Amino acid sequence: MTNSKYAMTATEVMEVIPNRYPIMFIDYVDEISENKILATKNVTINEEVFNGHFPGNPTFPGVLILESLAQAGSILILKKEEFQGKMAYIGGIDKAKFRQKVVPGDVMKLEFEITKFRGKVGKADATAYVDGKKVTTCEFTFIVDEAAEQEK
C-alpha cells in the first residue's frame, strides 16, 4: 500500500482486478474491510459512452453503474487471500432500482457488502450514491472461478 489518503489507489486496484480502460470504473477505494468496500468512480464528460448516451443530455448508463458496483465487489472478493489472482463473475442481479440519473461531474460512491458467502458463491447488497443520495441499489449473486488465473 502506498502513502495515500485512499485505502487503494487506481494502480493498486489494477493489481487486483483485470479490468482496464475503457471498462475500468474504479478510480480509488476509500475503505475496505472483510465484507464491505466503499469505492469511488468519478464520472467525467471525457468518457467514451457520452458520445452516444445521450448527445445533448449525457447520462451514465444504468448498466455501467451496475458494472461499477460489480468491480468494487470484485476488488473486495479478490483481495481475500484464498482468491487472489482468481476471477470473480456476476452470477445474477436482483432488485435493481435506479432512483436518479448520473451525469458528468458526479462522484459516485460505490458500496458493496457481502451478506452470504459459501464456498465460491455469495450474495451481496450494493448501493451507488451521489452527494449522499442513493442513485442505484441491487443485490448481486457472485461466483469465484478458482480455476481461472488472471493474465498480468
Regions found by a protein language model. Give the residues of each.
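Conserved positions in beta-strands of structured domains
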Residues: 27-30, 94, 99, 113-115
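Catalytic strand-loop segment that frames the active site of acyl-thioester-processing enzymes
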Residues: 21-60
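Hydrophobic beta-strand-centered segment that forms part of the acyl-chain substrate-binding groove
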Residues: 2-7, 73-109, 135-143
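N-terminal leader/capping segments at the start of a protein or of a new domain
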Residues: 1-26, 31
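Active-site helix/loop of acyl-thioester processing domains in fatty-acid/polyketide metabolism
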Residues: 29, 60-83
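Small/polar/charged residue-enriched interaction surfaces, especially the RNA/DNA-contacting tracks
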Residues: 6, 19, 39-42, 144
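Short, hydrophobic/aromatic-enriched beta-strand segments in well-ordered soluble domains
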Residues: 41, 111-114
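HotDog/MaoC-like acyl-thioester-processing domains
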Residues: 3-5, 36, 102-106, 113-152
